[in-house]
């Protein structure tokens, strides 16, 4: 259900350039998106799991905040992340 260590390091190197760049906004958005995808699959199997649904909504809110920050700081990086992750905005 959660991201494996290999998946997480692949996402970090793809969006951050190096494994140490975990604080970049692009990396954070990509990691949130991976976790959101996993939770969405879990909730399709278990529709009555209200606690996981709350966690999903919290992750979506966190991702939205980081995306808003990125849009205000650097619109080009924001557009690139949106295009790479196929997010609606």
Curated annotation (Swiss-Prot):
Signal sequence, renumbered to the chain: none
Keywords attached to this entry: Ribonucleoprotein, Ribosomal protein, RNA-binding, rRNA-binding
Pfam families in UniProt: Ribosomal_S15
Domain of life the protein comes from: Bacteria
Gene3D superfamilies the record matches: 6.10.250.3130, S15/NS1, RNA-binding
Gene Ontology biological process terms in this record: translation
Keyword hit for RNA-binding: yes
GO cellular component terms attached to this protein's record: cytosolic small ribosomal subunit
Molecular function (Gene Ontology), one example: rRNA binding
HAMAP family to which the protein is assigned, alphabetical: Ribosomal_uS15_B (MF_01343_B)
Described function: One of the primary rRNA binding proteins, it binds directly to 16S rRNA where it helps nucleate assembly of the platform of the 30S subunit by binding and bridging several RNA helices of the 16S rRNA. Forms an intersubunit bridge (bridge B4) with the 23S rRNA of the 50S subunit in the ribosome.
Family: Belongs to the universal ribosomal protein uS15 family.
Subunit structure of this chain's protein: Part of the 30S ribosomal subunit. Forms a bridge to the 50S subunit in the 70S ribosome, contacting the 23S rRNA.
Name the record gives this protein: Small ribosomal subunit protein uS15
Protein species of origin: Chlorobium limicola (strain DSM 245 / NBRC 103803 / 6330)
């Amino acid at each position: 259900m959660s991201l494996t260590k290999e998946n997480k390091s692949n996402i970090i190197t793809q969006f951050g350039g190096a494994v140490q760049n975990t604080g970049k906004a692009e990396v954070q958005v990509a990691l949130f998106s991976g976790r959101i995808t996993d939770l969405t699959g879990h909730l399709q199997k278990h529709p009555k799991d209200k606690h996981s649904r709350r966690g999903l909504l919290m992750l979506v809110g966190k991702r939205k905040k980081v995306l808003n920050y990125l849009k205000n700081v650097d619109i080009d990086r924001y557009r690139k992340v949106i295009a790479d992750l196929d997010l609606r905005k």
